[in-house]
Amino acid sequence: MYKLLILMILLGTGQYTLAQHENHKPAQQQQSEIYTCPMHPEVQSTRPGKCPKCGMTLVKQKLKAPAKQQQAPPKKAVKAKPAPTKQRVQQKSAQPAQKKDQPAHKHAQPTKKKPATPVQNPEVKEKPVHKAGHKPESPRQAYKPRTVRYDLYVRDTLVNFTGRTRRAVAINGSIPAPALTFTQGDTAEIYVHNEMDVETSIHWHGVFLPNRFDGVPWLTQKPIKPHSTYLYKFPIIQNGTYWYHSHSAFQEQSGMYGALIFNKVNEPDMPAIPIVLSDWTDRNPKEVYRSLRSANDWFSIQKGATQGYAEAIRKGYFGTKLKNEWKRMTAMDVSDVAYEKFLTNGQDIAEQTHFTAGDTVKLRVVNGGASTYFWLTYSGSKITVVGNDGNDVEPVEVDRLIIAPAETYDLLVTLPENMQYEFLATAEDRSNTTSLWLGRGMKMKAKRLGKLNYFEGMKMMNDMMKLNGDIEPMDMEMSNQKMDMNSVMYPESSAQDHSMHGGETTEPAADTTMHMKQKADTTSHQGHTMQGHDMHNMNRSGSNGEKVTLNYGMLRAPEKTTLKPGPEKVLRFELTGNMNRYVWTLDNKTVSESDKILIKKGENVKIIMFNNSMMRHPMHLHGHDFRVLNKHGEYAPLKNVLDILPMETDTIEFAASESGDWFFHCHILYHMIAGMGRVFTYQNSPPNPDLPDPKLAQKMFNREDKIFLPSGQLGLESNGSDGEFVLGSSRYQISTEWRVGFKKEYGIESETYFGRYFGKMQWLFPFVGFDYHYNSVEDEAEENMFGQLSNQNNRKVAVAGVQYTLPMLILSEMRVDTKGKLRFQLRREDVPLTSRLRLNLMGNTDKEYMAGLRYIVTKYVSLSTHYDSDMKYGAGLTFVY
């Protein structure tokens, strides 16, 4: 009874105390909800309205108790240990630490946790340094920086995205890899456990960190060996949306990528979803690259982008097709690879159903695709862009935007009703889409983008391309994506039908700054005429309800980004490439053919780039942000990836404030592997302890774009076998072609050449080789067209000569053998009569000739027939590799 009485007294006292506390609460604490700005959370109001700083609509938020605002809620995977100056957080394996994050990919095989193995590098201490655009905040709440540990287990796995089981690379059993979340001020401690039988690495894309942890094999570190562990440790001095991916071989294409979220100390209380977009191919990525290098057009067939002569005639573009080949160009395309699937957080269709009407959601979008650009649209409202490449930008509303490989965007979207709205990502080539659905209820689909009219793009490129392969500069301002020349191919664009209706703008009304000289139906520039193209829609204003497309000219930093005064170093790069042999370069030099570019700490480095190729390139600089010089002057946006379109000239600048070696390269994976990049090296940098032998490291780093890859074809027909085997690198090639008759009188022939390609377009190929002809039945000599005696049946001679690609893609060859005999030959292969039917022709001064047809059944098998002056008529199969 005594204990019961004591308990009743204590309960009564507690209730009285709580009641007194509630009665003395400030009025603001009793307020149940307030209105805040998503970009400026310090702006608070008791009524709806607009933000006085940026003009954005204030968002209703429930007011939390002060105690809850002072400390972030504990996370399940986090165990705190007290420390004098910092809180240490340990996580046994990486899990998405952000609310409403993506689930692990259900098709990837799970990975069992294993104890950490000894690391390959010692723990180091690094001091955070101030970076432009990432100034420390004045926090409204106390925050103790933590050391946050993640353990990443990299394993080979099996996935099924398409109905076929394929090999992939997963981190912690997930594709994409788990999102890693930190708060600005933390220290990242990431243990990478390589459980594969091959080497690996991880690059922390866009992150400012000690050079030795940048994650580029043989440039900043040794590769992580099989069945070993490597520690990446660096301070988090930024905030925003970033990502991480392998920088080893083709592992990025195979699934080794994930989101990296750096929260502000005072991150706005708004639901945020990391979205990792990616492209998936069932083919081995090494085979994809080999196919691109061998000029196999199977990917074009899959995408319906071969633009054969029959299609050109049917659609009224026969003259356009002829002019295209006269200028030695192949079919028009906007992408290199035909992908089976495009994925949103590892799914072709993802859902987040817990949102309701009025909710504003922040989408942290990462393009983790190896080579795919995505158009982003949303069915519920306009899209508000608030961040790019981890940096805040002043909010800008658009109807759509294109995101390049490796770019990140922070986007705000709102659900207007209690329905399900589609955030749609469409591949630039319009071959397929992937979606994220927000909310629940009736599905409100985003409008699909129509198929591209490639012949209109071909017509445009014909007018812009010189006969020598250069793109002729135009008499108009082309920079910062403000003039998308590809819009002539868009069915939703007025440029296709040359009308003035339904066009799209790339800037709001105040941004109409294109300088164009237009006449009635012709745009003239530097002796170069753009006939048949209405360029007006490329710079339409945002008035009259027209749709607005984002470009870099519209991005403005919220604070000044000007560099501190200092010596300036100006560099100029011409982006060059050759789709026929798939060699991509800067100034016609690959990484291995170029010296490192020396820069000094304290310099301001300005880079002026002109894209003199037919493809767009997302150029990425490791370890730095650069200013993209646009009309906003002191408020130029900060980025780490710049998408540069064909014919564009763009200028960027950055403060040289680091040490060590930093990679600058095109972020289309296959372009980078081909050699499109440079290395910036800080003078007087201390030695990298992870690379004790710099010469060996340089040799290993340069191997990538020098690799020799095989290709060839084997014909088995009724009259015999003919074929060719080629082993080629970016510059050198050795090839052997043969003809073996099934009858004795047909004999055996083979010609072997070794040579080097020269020039930006690689049309010139000097060679040496050996010619072997043998016939046991016939041994006759006759005069060739030069009046020289030629034994076509029995000869064994060394040869030297040169090949040159003529207009119409005709391969000409002049050679001389060790007996002084000359031979001139013309050959054209794979004339695209239809999407799958190819014509082959050959003739030379030895009075040899050939004509044949090949119908492509699969990537590796064709039906074929041909007539040969020596072996006569035959039909059968041709196997292509």
Residue ranges and their predicted role:
Residues 55-65:
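Short Cys/His-rich micro-motifs in 6-15 aa windows
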Residues 851-856, 869-881:
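Outer-membrane beta-barrel "beta-signal"
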Residues 292-294, 682-744, 776, 780, ...:
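Outer-membrane beta-barrel initiation region
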Residues 37, 51:
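Short cysteine-rich clusters marking metal-coordination/redox-active sites
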Residues 708-718, 731-742, 750-752, 764-774, ...:
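Transmembrane beta-strand segments that form the barrel wall of outer-membrane beta-barrel proteins
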Residues 723, 752-754, 800-802, 824-826, ...:
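Membrane-embedded beta-strands of outer-membrane beta-barrel proteins
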Residues 69-70, 75-77, 81-88, 96-97, ...:
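Histidine-centered copper-binding motifs that mark active-site loops
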Residues 699, 724, 729-731, 753-760, ...:
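Outer-membrane beta-barrel proteins
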